[in-house]
Structure formats: structure tokens, C-alpha cells
Amino acid sequence: MKKERTFFLNLLGEGKDTIEKKAGETIVNIGQPGEHTYLLKSGTARIDLIGGKHTVELGPGDLIGLMGSIDGRDYEDTTVAITDCQLIPIDQKRAEYLFREHPTFAFHVIKVLIDRFYFAMDLAKRYRQAGVAI
């Protein structure tokens, strides 16, 4: 398990405000207002990218809808539960508290954002090389 996943679970895994999603249920939907980031406490989920042309599987410790609690923008993709999932919601107020009181939280979020940036760049490069419009 990546160090960031373990860190997030250790910091937030005992959250009392757990949300349950059954397999097949949508966790966040593209275009929906981004009010929360969700920590995937248990289960697996799938992000549908580029209109479902590409998917990414997520597991315990992964963050879903990361920008939701940072700037409140609409979700950029749809995430669906593959198996039954437990999620811990992080709203903007809680995110601000975590950034302020747990600087290591901010460091790990930045690492996740960097990983996702490089993943997106690599995916775009592969699509361009294949002559596929995205």
C-alpha cells in the first residue's frame, strides 16, 4: 500500500461520519457540485475517465473527489463503487483544519495531486501517440 494511503487511513480511518455505498452505486458524479472529498475506508471503486474510455481502480486509503473539499468545483469525473464501500467525507472546513493542524496531511495531498498529474500527462501522451482525440 502506498505511503499516502496508509497515512490517510491512520489519520482519518476512525471517522465516525462513515457513508456506505453498495456495489454499483455512484459515489461522485461528473458535473455534481464538489462539496466533499471522500476517503475510501474499505471496498473498491472505479473512476471513469474521458467519458468512460479509461478507468482507474481505487482501494482503501485512496481519496475520491479530491478538489471538492479544496475549492468546491464540480466533480470532473464519475466514481462508482465496485464492491460495497465505506467512505469518510471531508468537507472544506475539515480539510482546512487538517491542512492547518496536520501539515503532513498537506504534504501527502500534494504528493497525491502530483501522482495524478503525471498519470494524466502519461495518459494524454498515450492517447496522442495512438491518434485518439480526447
Which sequence ranges carry the predicted segments?
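Cytosolic regulatory regions built on CNB/CRP/Popeye-like sensor folds
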Residues: 1-134
